[in-house]
Structure formats: C-alpha cells, structure tokens
Amino acid sequence: MSNNIHSPTVFVVQDPDGKEITLAAKYGKLHVILTGKESTDVALNKLHRVLSEMKPGDYLLPIGKSINMGIAIHFAWHYLKINSLCNPVDLNILVWRREQYEYTVETIKL
C-alpha cells in the first residue's frame, strides 16, 4: 500500500546570497529556484516550470529581486488554484522575523 501523504516543499525564489535560510527547513524541503543571475525572461520561464509543482501545504519564501518575487507569487497563486481541490486556497508565505530570529507563516486566502 502506497503512502500518498504530501511532504511540504519550501520554494525559495532566489539563492539567498549569504543570507541564512536553513531555519526555513522546519517547514519542508528547501528548493531554491533561481540563482539571481538569470535574465527576466529566463527567470519567468523557470519560475513557471518549477512552481507548477506547488501544492496546498507547500510554502513560498520570497527572497531576491523584486521582479522575481512578484512573478513567483503570481505563479504560486495560479498553480495552487489549479493543483487544489479546495476553494479558497491558502498561499503560505514565509516571512523572516528578525526580532524572534525565525520564519513565520503568513497565509493569504485566495
């Protein structure tokens, strides 16, 4: 009998370039999408392809160039709507809380 339980993924928009993100791993497996060196067109295509795998229960860690974060949030919302059987859908965004030295979840109902 197979186990169909979804293990959460933390989709990290861009390589953190020296910033510490390992604390986000408590929410799921870290998957860094972009290096930050891609052109906007290449970044758009890669974000589109990778975030098509996003499912309810996954997380988005928006870090990096503003345009890449905006595109990532758009695709995350789009694919969560497609990949979810629920309506509305929750988009889980990880936010760094400097004072507490931890990531917390901000959930947006879509």
Regions found by a protein language model. Give the residues of each.
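Glycine-rich beta-strand-to-loop/alpha-helix junction loops that act as flexible
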Residues: 63-65
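Long, low-complexity, Lys/Arg-enriched
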Residues: 1-59, 74-110
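Short, well-ordered alpha-helical microsegments
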Residues: 68-73
